[in-house]
Amino acid sequence: MSLVDVDGLSLRYGARTVLSRVSLSIAPGEIVTIVGPNGSGKTSLLRAIIGAVKPFQGRVTRGAGVTLGYVPQKLHIDETLPMTVARFLRLPGGASEAEIDQALAQAGVRDLSGSQLAQLSGGQFQRVMLARALIGKPDLLLLDEATQGLDQRGSASFYQQIEQVRRDTGCAVLMISHELHVVMSASDRVICLNGHVCCEGTPAVVASAPEYRALFGTGTGGALALYRHEHDHEHDHHDGCAHGQATEDRTEAAE
């Protein structure tokens, strides 16, 4: 039984088609990474899944009793507003101190409860946002460009924490990124989106490949991997995805 089923989903903003006939499903406990260029409809897909936008065609079906946790791409907090992490996590549902402590521990920032939001680093703030999403004990965790603005080491650390969250809680994870060449090595599936589903498959884990180490750097603990784009079709609408040749070009450039 799937947690979420997306069947033939099409979205339009005015006269512009953002998504066309997208179908996918998320099973309990799996990690799915959606990759694609800017403007490919990734965030729109997430918004449709959480019910923030209505489909033009198709439907999104959520399993009975399935709960979602959502980490947005960005959240602006007034830096002049004095607010501790604990106070932020209590809004708006009034989470208990025990629930806050557990969520912060699961996000890997147990000691930040009394810290001011305005004083957090980008990586710490993303962990706090993750903790906020985990308070409700979601069946499916959705993350929209969760590592945007983080350096490579920070991104790898965050990905590793997501793997730990899945192991600890059993929740499924749906992550999106615009970086076609970087995905979680722990992903069960990778879906390439560019207005429609271009392709999907498992990511290649490349821990020992020197050219990929040169591209992604060291110290990532295998959390970053390369997804090779190999398509057997041509696109009849939207701009084309970044295919295998583009990936190879990036690798050569990095060397």
UniProtKB/Swiss-Prot annotation:
Stored SUPFAM superfamilies: P-loop containing nucleoside triphosphate hydrolases
Keyword presence, Cell inner membrane: yes
Membrane-spanning residues: none
Enzyme's top EC category: translocase
Entries under InterPro entries matching the protein: AAA+_ATPase (IPR003593), ABC_transporter-like_ATP-bd (IPR003439), ABC_transporter-like_CS (IPR017871), Metal_Ion_Import_ABC (IPR050153), P-loop_NTPase (IPR027417)
Claim: Ribonucleoprotein is one of the keywords in the record: no
Molecular functions per Gene Ontology: ABC-type zinc transporter activity; ATP binding; ATP hydrolysis activity
Catalytic activity: Zn(2+)(out) + ATP(in) + H2O(in) = Zn(2+)(in) + ADP(in) + phosphate(in) + H(+)(in)
Stretches for region Disordered: 234-255
Catalytic activity, EC: 7.2.2.20
GO BP annotations listed: response to zinc ion
Domain ABC transporter: 4-219
Gene Ontology CC, one term: plasma membrane
Membrane topology: Peripheral membrane protein
PANTHER family: METAL TRANSPORT SYSTEM ATP-BINDING PROTEIN TM_0124-RELATED (PTHR42734), ZINC IMPORT ATP-BINDING PROTEIN ZNUC (PTHR42734:SF9)
Subunit structure, as described in the record: The complex is composed of two ATP-binding proteins (ZnuC), two transmembrane proteins (ZnuB) and a solute-binding protein (ZnuA).
Protein family (similarity comment): Belongs to the ABC transporter superfamily. Zinc importer (TC 3.A.1.15.5) family.
Purpose: Part of the ABC transporter complex ZnuABC involved in zinc import. Responsible for energy coupling to the transport system.
Protein name: Zinc import ATP-binding protein ZnuC
Gene from which the chain derives: znuC
